[in-house]
Amino acid sequence: MKRISALCALAIVVASFTQVTSSAAERPTSVKGCAKPTAKAHAPATLKQPTAVDKKLAKTMTINTNCGVITIALDPAAPQTVTNLATLARSKYFDGTYCHRLTTEGIYVLQCGDPSAQGNGSPGSWKGYKDENLPANKILTYPAGTVAMANSSPNTNGSQFFLVYKDTTLPPSYTIWGKIKTGLPLLLRIEKVGAYKVDQTSGNAYYTGDGYPVQPIEIKSVTVR
């Protein structure tokens, strides 16, 4: 998934969605069981980038969100990626951030990992790192349950990643670094509520197949072991 720029700042986007709900009240605007988010978008932290692969790779990542828990089995076939993401998790880089992108038409992913919630943020001072473990299957490249890195071009990985909740075919350009073990039903519930963008002229929000999740998804904490 390419990194994208949000149409406006997070606070403006969230506030504007009330304008679409009044004219589309028949559509749900929240996922049952989700708590009210409290995080604020912020600039990505500046952290030291790992220069070598961890001698003992983490095996599991647990993402605690305001809507529930997502558990990921980490793939040793992407050792540098797993090392870098584990470093970010241990530094609490992801804590108090939002998943900023949901796609529901043709491509089925929830994208997270940018503290600015604008789709173009990565750790300050980090250089893009190499792609690893690219899909071997050129027909169904990213099946449901896959977790992969977002990037803007080859070898530009940072902190953004996407969770695939339905079978998705994309160019085989995105590092696969994990598989969802628990939490896939939650992602399907998030999909049903949908995504939106904001019209820059009117300021009104509208439903779209590629935008900000209608149900805000806040990452409370990320742990690895």
What do these predicted ranges mean?
Residues 2-4, 8, 13-225:
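Cyclophilin-like peptidyl-prolyl cis-trans isomerases
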